[in-house]
Regions:
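Divalent-metal coordination cores built from histidine and acidic residues
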Residues: 1-89
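Histidine/acidic residue-rich metal-binding segments in metalloenzymes
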Residues: 32-35, 39-42, 67-94, 99-170
Length: 170
């Protein structure tokens, strides 16, 4: 969730290899409607939901490349703010995967602008874990500092023996 709007079918199709076909009754328009549906089934629900930037970007712009237009950013921000208001506790990024791979660093900062000084964490799978690992970490530190928001880097690792002793940026 959310999975609604002009690009919802495109987003659902992209998710098929991960989730399988998502039947219409499980395409929730918001995080709130997802939580209500789960609670309505009597499930003992205890979870913290991250809103996926890939989902937000796809809903706003489909699989276009490059930075988002002002109209697409407005749509993305609307969905992000609604998901956070509904109870999402952070924003998840997978910068090694489409469509998030298409962001420039500045474009990423613009897309994440609603998080500025919010205390809402960015949880990221960085662009690189091999030879570009230090640059990828620098990029995310730049984003978090620009937004003045917490950063969580998932699966911190440096692939390849030549990367094992690289200095971590401060």
């Amino acid at each position: 969730a959310p999975l609604s709007g002009a690009h919802a079918d495109e987003c659902a199709k992209y998710l098929v290899p991960i989730t399988g076909n998502i039947p219409p009754e499980l395409r929730f328009a918001s995080i709130d409607s997802y939580f209500k549906a789960a609670q309505g089934r009597g499930l003992p629900l205890s979870c913290a939901e991250l809103i996926g930037m890939g989902t937000l970007r796809t809903l706003a712009a489909g699989f276009t490349t490059g930075d988002l237009s002002p109209l697409e950013l407005r749509d993305l921000h609307y969905h992000m703010e609604a998901a956070l208001a509904d109870g999402a506790c952070g924003v998840s990024l997978g910068l090694g995967y489409a469509p998030e791979i298409f962001y420039s660093t500045d474009g990423l900062i613009r897309a994440l602008a609603p998080l500025h000084r919010s205390g809402v964490p960015i949880c990221v799978h960085m662009r690189q874990e091999g030879d570009g690992v230090v640059d990828a970490l620098r990029e995310m530190l730049e984003v978090a500092r620009a937004l003045q928001t917490p950063l969580e880097v998932s699966h911190v690792k440096a692939i390849g023996s030549r990367n094992a002793r690289k200095a971590v940026p401060q």
